[in-house]
Amino acid sequence: MELGEQIINPTEERLRLSTQYGVEHLVIDSRPNQQLMGDDGAWDGRKIEAQRKWVEGFGMSLDVLALDVDSILLDSIHNPERARRVADRLRKDIQAAADGGVTTLKYNLQMVGITRTGFIEGRGGVRGSAFQARNYSPNSDEKFSYWGVGHPGADQHGSDIAANALGTKEAVGQVLSAKSGGVTQQQGWDALAYFVEQVIPTAEKAGVRLAAHPHDPAYPPGGLNGVEHVVGSIDGIRKFLDLAPESVAHGLNFCQGTVAEMSEDPSAYVVEAIREFGGRKRIYMVHFRNIKGGYLDFSECFPDEGSVDMAAAIRTYREVGYDGILCPDHVPVSDLDPARERFFGFALGYTRGLLQAIPA
């Protein structure tokens, strides 16, 4: 396993800092990634190659790009003509990535935002983004959820990214559940099947792996505000992978924090999921983060203090032969670290320490 970092709109200064942290593997999380677009709005393989070589100039490899799937899943239910247009652009993006030398693309299955209901004070006064189903309301959803690359609470802490990207391109097609038109379980699975049918054959031919981020968070039975999260359990992840069970192009951005959110026993659940999906060789990258709490009641936290035994997770990745990257994700917010660079530095160091303490 290797230490990785994901960065939105990286600058020369920020990449220099990453190399000083000891990072050798980069994920660019920009969505949409304007630097890669051609005149038609699709990625240009030559621009991807240039970005890859730019990253390599800092001594790092560009392992993964974020594929902006826009609102294709929701559109496949409510606006099929627009879904077809997005699918056409995605096929071009996938081929361009292959042409530019980047062969893993991560993407998110969210149709609505990454639902949160507020903040909980944590260690030393930091604030951790939280989801407590009992406190859910459409108003808290709009105010506290992640929208695309936006981070909740950034307006209070001067974060380096938008506080609320809702309604902007950076929301990458995610909408308020109240304005989604609703998503039943059957519609959710139909949308995912549509996506897989539209893009996996192109990815297979291009030699590109698509790494899906599960639904964050798991919703209660019956969903929230008319929306079901069907990939919110190990069973759901298994069913999703079985939409193309033999395809090496079809795998996971295994968000360990999101998987932990699916259970009242998050540590055991994470280990079980790593064993199953790592054993199937369908984990293509990892969001190595922790939470406090579990199903329907959790808050984000530093990786060393949560409910998941992170050392046990490392041992399990080792056992199943996972040899990809571990990326920190979703650290708390604080006025003392408005860009969260120090907090991500802490998470990187903690991850490096575990990798060294638990060798292959």
Regions found by a protein language model. Give the residues of each.
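Generic structural motif recognizing short loop/turn segments at the entrances and edges of beta-strands
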Residues: 1, 127, 140-145, 224, ...
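N-terminal basic, low-complexity leaders that serve as flexible interaction/assembly modules and, when applicable
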Residues: 1-45, 52-53
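Histidine-acidic metal/acid-base catalytic patches
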Residues: 2-4, 9-11, 15-22, 56, ...
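Structural motif corresponding to the early beta-alpha repeats
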Residues: 29-193, 205, 258
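Short, surface-exposed recognition loops or helix-turn segments adjacent to catalytic cores
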Residues: 108, 214-215
